[in-house]
């Protein structure tokens, strides 16, 4: 995939921008706080339909404005398409999505239209955060290419909310509760099986990537750790834990309690890994998602790399350069030009550099 054009209006600190991209490597260079990551965020929203930094769309609107607008022109093989996102906060909150001038009502209809892989210093929370962060990572990844998975996940969460409301009522009708039990198991088992399948594939890519980064020293792997193993166990645990759930007021078992173990028999990297091991794991993990898109789904995503170049040592940088070379297109943010020379070296005739100052963007040679 290839992003050929980006239009931004009233987004973050950018009033109006129109940028054309004709190269494989795009560098946004500027001091901290100038708005370079905001450009990456805009691209990310066109892909994910949400920000990687902010949960509220209204906080993305430029100060003093009432709406923002994003447009991206995307090329996939020989086919070009246009994706548009508009958000208005006044007089009422409204979001409008368009694909090739046609209004889109369902978010799932845009899945797979523009696929990106993001690497940011914030990714360390996948390792250092709790199970919820790792579930969020795997769910977001699968949802980026499987609309039925996303719909099932949304439905599961609705069912869970209804079941929890019944539990909190203190004296629920057991027959009514059993209806929700059957529904939550049906949706949950589909999600469980899909997570298990995808993590197994990701692990094979992750281990190869990590071996390249660490010289084969770490021996770590990804292991899906479900809270329930199958349909029968799910139902049995729901029944067994009913008294406890009534006391707690929420559902204590299910796929919403799963985890993604990262480590080996000897250690869990989330608890015992060094900072270097954690950085390697994050890079290997994100690269594994890139490998999955490329080798399993036969699509090459756009890479979005937010200010991580300086943090990489020589070995990790060499590996990352090789990854970038195999990508269709990559966008970088950085505070200086020194850190990009390794990338420019192999693709020196395929680069564009944009200097960002006070919300203004200037193309430089």
Swiss-Prot record:
Residues reported in the UniProt entry to bind ATP:
30-37
GO MF terms, alphabetically ordered: ATP binding; single-stranded DNA binding
* GO (cellular component) term, any one: cytoplasm
Q: Could you tell me where this protein is found in the cell?
A: Cytoplasm
InterPro entries found in the cross-reference section = DNA-binding_RecF (IPR001238), DNA-binding_RecF_CS (IPR018078), P-loop_NTPase (IPR027417), RecF/RecN/SMC_N (IPR003395), RecF_2 (IPR042174)
Q: Does the keyword Iron apply?
A: no
Q: What family does this belong to? A: Belongs to the RecF family.
Q: What is this protein called?
A: DNA replication and repair protein RecF
Under PANTHER family, the record lists: DNA REPLICATION AND REPAIR PROTEIN RECF
Coiled-coil positions are none
Keyword check for Cytoplasm:
yes
Going by the entry's taxonomy, the superkingdom of the source organism is recorded as Bacteria
Instruction: Give the matching PROSITE patterns.
Output: RECF_1, RECF_2
Give the matching HAMAP family: RecF
Residues of the signal sequence? none
- What does this protein's UniProt record list under function? The RecF protein is involved in DNA metabolism; it is required for DNA replication and normal SOS inducibility. RecF binds preferentially to single-stranded, linear DNA. It also seems to bind ATP.
- Please give a single GO biological process term from the UniProt record: double-strand break repair
Q: Which is an annotated Pfam family here?
A: SMC_N
Q: Which UniProt keywords apply?
A: ATP-binding, Cytoplasm, DNA damage, DNA repair, DNA replication, DNA-binding, Nucleotide-binding, SOS response
Which species does this protein come from? Leptospira interrogans serogroup Icterohaemorrhagiae serovar Lai (strain 56601)
């Amino acid at each position: 995939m290839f992003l050929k054009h980006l239009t931004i209006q009233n987004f973050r600190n950018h009033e109006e921008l129109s940028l054309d991209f004709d190269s494989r490597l795009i560098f946004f260079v500027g001091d901290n706080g100038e708005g370079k990551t905001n450009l990456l965020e805009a691209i990310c929203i066109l892909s994910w339909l949400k920000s990687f930094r902010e949960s509220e769309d209204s906080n993305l609107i430029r100060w003093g404005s009432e709406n923002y607008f994003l447009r991206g022109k995307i090329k996939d093989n020989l086919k070009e398409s246009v994706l548009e996102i508009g958000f208005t906060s006044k007089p009422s909150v409204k979001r409008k999505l368009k694909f090739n001038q046609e209004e889109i009502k369902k978010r799932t209809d845009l899945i797979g239209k523009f696929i990106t892989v993001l690497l940011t210093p914030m990714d360390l929370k996948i390792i250092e955060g709790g199970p919820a962060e790792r579930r969020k990572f795997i769910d977001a990844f699968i949802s980026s290419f499987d609309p039925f998975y996303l719909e099932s996940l949304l439905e599961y969460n609705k069912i869970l909310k209804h079941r929890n409301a019944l539990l909190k009522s203190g004296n629920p009708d057991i027959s009514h509760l059993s209806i929700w039990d059957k529904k939550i198991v049906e949706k949950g088992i589909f999600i469980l099986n899909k997570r298990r399948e995808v993590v197994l594939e990701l692990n094979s890519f992750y281990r190869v990537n990590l071996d390249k980064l660490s010289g084969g020293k770490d021996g770590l792997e990804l292991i899906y750790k479900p809270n329930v193993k199958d349909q029968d166990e799910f139902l049995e645990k729901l029944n067994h834990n009913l008294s406890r759930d009534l006391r707690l007021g929420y559902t204590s078992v299910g796929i919403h309690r799963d985890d993604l173990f990262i480590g080996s028999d000897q250690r869990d990297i989330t608890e015992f890994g060094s900072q270097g091991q954690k950085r390697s794991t994050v890079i290997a993990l994100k690269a594994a998602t890139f490998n999955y898109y490329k080798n399993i789904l036969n699509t090459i995503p756009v890479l979005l790399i937010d200010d991580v170049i300086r943090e990489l040592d020589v070995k990790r940088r060499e590996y990352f350069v090789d990854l970038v070379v195999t990508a269709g297109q990559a966008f970088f943010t950085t505070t200086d030009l020194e850190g990009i020379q390794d990338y420019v070296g192999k693709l020196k005739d395929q680069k564009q550099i944009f200097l960002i100052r006070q919300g203004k963007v200037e193309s430089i040679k």
